[in-house]
Amino acid sequence: MTEIADPRDRLIVALDLPSVQAAEALIDRIGDAATFYKIGYQLGYAGGLALAERLAARGLKVFLDLKLHDIGNTVEEGVRSASGSGATFLTVHAYPQTMRAAVRGRGAGLRILAVTVLTSYDDADAAEAGYGLPVAELVAKRAAQAAEIGIDGLVCSAAEAGSVRRIVGPDRLIVTPGIRPAGAEAGDQKRVMTPGDARRAGIDHVVVGRPITGAADPRAVAQAIVADLA
């Protein structure tokens, strides 16, 4: 696990919202209770990439969850473009050619995270998609490939975090979605964990969306999660 001085940096708030205006309103409500925000497809296609630059200019950290996967040159140039946004993290799918291209394009300030297997997948989903391995084995294989290629960190479920840590060692980042405070609904995530359990499992950053974005007091929820992560 990497050393992180400010426990707020361990929480990544997922801005899974339909507009930049909604995202900015949420960020204002959260205030200094959070320092790290994730922008994915929904917001990214609605002006979120420009928002990423503005947030970075304010000293906030940004995770571009774009899950790139294409031919090598396209990924390399896409990563190179994303590096100009000021983002801290960018995701790619954990296919060897994609990861190698991302490493070539990342530049100095951007960290590349490889998505092993989506946290909405279980073994039945993996089989339906044509993978010949159960989820745990597929995650382990992709984690080992990512470490060999030089990826900065892995995105995996909390259920696989321990095995991933053993494979990639102490210095690579582990980022985990599907984190739910105690008592929160799992939603469409199938492999979940509480923030405190995630911290004890050696996870560096947790991604939390709906429990914060849908809360009556998102600042209070963010503060409670950070306290659980400290």
Curated annotation (Swiss-Prot):
InterPro entries registered for this protein in UniProt: Aldolase_TIM (IPR013785), OMPdecase (IPR014732), OMPdecase_AS (IPR018089), OMPdecase_bac (IPR047596), OMPdeCOase_dom (IPR001754), RibuloseP-bd_barrel (IPR011060)
GO biological process: 'de novo' pyrimidine nucleobase biosynthetic process; 'de novo' UMP biosynthetic process
GO-annotated molecular function: orotidine-5'-phosphate decarboxylase activity
Metabolic or biological pathway: Pyrimidine metabolism; UMP biosynthesis via de novo pathway; UMP from orotate: step 2/2
Transmembrane segments: none
Catalysis performed (reactions): orotidine 5'-phosphate + H(+) = UMP + CO2
One Gene Ontology term, aspect cellular component: cytosol
UniProt-listed Pfam families: OMPdecase
Superkingdom of origin organism: Bacteria
EC number, as in UniProt: 4.1.1.23
PANTHER family: OROTIDINE 5'-PHOSPHATE DECARBOXYLASE (PTHR32119:SF2)
Protein task: Catalyzes the decarboxylation of orotidine 5'-monophosphate (OMP) to uridine 5'-monophosphate (UMP).
Protein family according to the UniProt entry: Belongs to the OMP decarboxylase family. Type 1 subfamily.
Quaternary data: Homodimer.
Name of the protein: Orotidine 5'-phosphate decarboxylase
Taxonomic placement: Bacteria, Pseudomonadati, Pseudomonadota, Alphaproteobacteria, Hyphomicrobiales
